[in-house]
Amino acid sequence: MEFKIVETSLNLRVERRLGKQNNDYLLSKDVAEEQLKLDADVYCNVEYMECQDKKYMEAFETAGYTAYKALDSYNQRGVMYMVKNDYPVKVIHMFEEPHMMHIQLNKEGTIFNLITVRILISGSDDADYQSRKEQWDKVLNYIDSLENKDNLCITGDFNHGVISEAYKEDQSRRFFNYQMLVDTLRERNISLAPIEGMSYKGYMKIDHLAVCDNLHVLEAEYLDVFGEHRIIGVPDHSMIVARVEAV
């Protein structure tokens, strides 16, 4: 049994220093229409936020999807899944820091465990990267606690920074980096899907798809349909588009 998954960073945030509030921002129907062209079984959205999103939500509802959200209490911001109505969904758990949501999706009798994560960032200094590592450890501890890890798929924005072969003593990334992500997942028999290219600003590969041993990634790619811009509410990362099969 296979399913199609799309991960998107919706690029929503509140500019509180400018006196803005959630309703000052728009998540438009145009964004929904671009996502819906991909006809995924499930859309895993990070950087979602309660805002002016009525037409966006209506577009998915009309197309036959149900929204499942895990939002923080401060900004009403976090993870949102859109899942085809054909598939029963069970919400398992969520975190506010990092943003994380775990659901189980039942496709024709096959249960898929989906975890979507966004590691939160602040100033890119040592303390920030230490916090990112603590957030990732929290996710790992949660994975370790699961009794049922069958058909486990993890996706999202892991915010480990630029990938280097080594990290100097004066680089904050020494506290949390791509290699740590790969190694800690491998220790749990979870591997990153190889995806060509970069996912953010043309030089960072921080959005990933990871699967357990009994899932096979049939194909996975970064897809950029929104271009370069600075518009809040329009995705600024490449989407991950993938087909995954239970074996």
Q: Which residues make up each language-model segment?
A:
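His/acidic metal-ligating clusters that form di-metal
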Residues: 135-160
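Active-site neighborhood of phospho(di)ester-bond hydrolases with catalytic His/Asp-centered motifs
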Residues: 43-47, 68-70, 153-157, 191-195
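N-terminal, active-site-proximal structural segment of metallo-dependent hydrolase catalytic domains
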Residues: 1-61, 247
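Structured beta-strand-rich core segments of catalytic domains in phosphoester-bond hydrolases
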Residues: 42-121, 221-223
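Surface-exposed cleft-lining segments at the edges of enzyme active sites
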Residues: 16-20, 91, 118-136, 162, ...
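Metal-dependent phosphoester-hydrolase catalytic domains
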Residues: 93, 146, 160-247
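Internal catalytic-core helix/loop-beta-alpha segment
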Residues: 103, 115, 129-144
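Catalytic metal-binding/acid-base residues of hydrolase active sites
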Residues: 11-13, 49, 88, 118-120, ...
